[in-house]
Amino acid sequence: MATGKGAAASTQEGKSQPFKVTPGPFDPATWLEWSRQWQGTEGNGHAAASGIPGLDALAGVKIAPAQLGDIQQRYMKDFSALWQAMAEGKAEATGPLHDRRFAGDAWRTNLPYRFAAAFYLLNARALTELADAVEADAKTRQRIRFAISQWVDAMSPANFLATNPEAQRLLIESGGESLRAGVRNMMEDLTRGKISQTDESAFEVGRNVAVTEGAVVFENEYFQLLQYKPLTDKVHARPLLMVPPCINKYYILDLQPESSLVRHVVEQGHTVFLVSWRNPDASMAGSTWDDYIEHAAIRAIEVARDISGQDKINVLGFCVGGTIVSTALAVLAARGEHPAASVTLLTTLLDFADTGILDVFVDEGHVQLREATLGGGAGAPCALLRGLELANTFSFLRPNDLVWNYVVDNYLKGNTPVPFDLLFWNGDATNLPGPWYCWYLRHTYLQNELKVPGKLTVCGVPVDLASIDVPTYIYGSREDHIVPWTAAYASTALLANKLRFVLGASGHIAGVINPPAKNKRSHWTNDALPESPQQWLAGAIEHHGSWWPDWTAWLAGQAGAKRAAPANYGNARYRAIEPAPGRYVKAKA
């Protein structure tokens, strides 16, 4: 043990080093130490504030010696080969850089940068293999993998001016103008509080997005109800009520005429009503899950039935909108009411046993923190979950695509983002009431109680999803990272009546918004519903193109005979208030 001046000097030297000497990089203790030291430095508060997990989960985890040895041996072999190739100037020894971040000629033809990219990819592979090899429960392993991937993605040489040859070339060719423009872009984004992903000035809700013709026929403090103008002379008797997620603006379902699911359904001869959620302000900070069920979902069903003159209507829920719809119908069933002729659930979770990547954000400590700061716990005032925080969290689920890609293009290269309607919608964030959010976190993501008959009481009655005894169409997207398709399939075990499950290609949004005219992607069908989703897929038939025609054919069978299309919006009780898309969707977070 060091004593006297030596000990003091050693202590002082240790304090002056931002990252102390630790065991080798193949020891999980190293990762834990890096994480703790990083969390102790200035400017690191974002991770804790946003709920992004750190690496404290690494405490006590191990890697099997044989597996660790294999990773070490493979790493050292490839590292030595790269080092020798660099010393000899053999660029071809790196092999092709199979990563779009390094696809440009500047990376391929400039040896120092080519080797920098190759060493980075080698280290990234090794760290990922180590994260996958830890001996821990599934949730801990997923958190470690997520934290490692965040660090690895952030440290790409493409993200820094000093190690990005494309940005350096632009800097020289533009005489410094690219850097000047990049700094200007960064300062504007700092003012806005988010990274620009598109040229938002190119879009306006109601002018060139969300343009399907219609009117607001009802509104309260939670939502506006839109009714769309018929595009056919005759329409099915039963209307369709669409309930989008309240964590986003509704117009993902009505971006452009050629990609609008709303317009497509109207063109098939359906009267369409749609919930346009209010963007909560301080006056709604205390709103609860029960409020959204009673005063939004159930109220929308009542108004759509009244205007259409139908005892039963078809109902569609998208993402958390599907969770809200299912809860509302179960509440109504407990009251002896059955207003739905059919239900459509798009990328919806009812069984929250597998919540995909979002599971890394949810544990008892995090939920308690949210309840104390947002949900009115311990006598504290209720507050809003700001849409900007939610949007940033979702962006970091795909950091290379939605964060670092724009850091490089906008800041290092000084480019202006191109107009893109989907990214305009993605950046149009909405707030959430704290109590609503906390209830949703605890009772679904954390405790998975919605699937248990009678476990939850909502609006004063016990909830039993099996009481939703109507034909149900369930859709999942195969590459969905928010609602894994196998989790969407799990709803088939909870609902009671004639069920149809269809699987689409692509992800959470692109899989859903897949108009037939583009003839893109594919979908899978299987009339059987075995217990295992893997068994379902093994017996499924793949069909080229959109799943929309399959769904609209099914929906037509639930919608009743056709009659003359209504000449006016609403009825004597519910008159048109203003043209679609209405005021609520235009409110900014």
UniProtKB/Swiss-Prot annotation:
Subcellular localization(s) per the UniProt record: Cytoplasm
Biotechnological utility: Forms a biodegradable plastic that is degraded naturally and completely by bacteria into carbon dioxide and water. Utilized in the medical industry. Plates made from PHA-based plastics can be left in place to help heal fractured bones. After the bone has healed, the plastic slowly breaks down in the body. Utilized by Imperial Chemical Industries (ICI) to produce a PHB-PHV (poly-B-valerate) copolymer sold under the trade name 'Biopol'. Biopol is used as packaging material. The PHB-PHV copolymer consists of approximately 20% PHV and 80% PHB.
PANTHER family: POLY(3-HYDROXYALKANOATE) POLYMERASE SUBUNIT PHAC, POLY-3-HYDROXYBUTYRATE SYNTHASE
Name listed for the protein in its UniProt record: Poly(3-hydroxyalkanoate) polymerase subunit PhaC
Function: Polymerizes (R)-3-hydroxybutyryl-CoA to create polyhydroxybutyrate (PHB) which consists of thousands of hydroxybutyrate molecules linked end to end. PHB serves as an intracellular energy reserve material when cells grow under conditions of nutrient limitation.
Family per record: Belongs to the PHA/PHB synthase family. Type I PhaC subfamily.
Domain of life of the organism encoding this protein: Bacteria
Lineage: Bacteria, Pseudomonadati, Pseudomonadota, Betaproteobacteria, Burkholderiales
Transmembrane segments: none
GO cellular component, one term: cytoplasm
GO biological process: poly-hydroxybutyrate biosynthetic process
Reactions catalysed, as given in the entry: (3R)-3-hydroxybutanoyl-CoA + [(3R)-hydroxybutanoate](n) = [(3R)-hydroxybutanoate](n+1) + CoA
GO molecular function, a single term: acyltransferase activity
E.C. no: 2.3.1.-
Ranges for region Disordered: 1-23
Complex formation: Monomer.
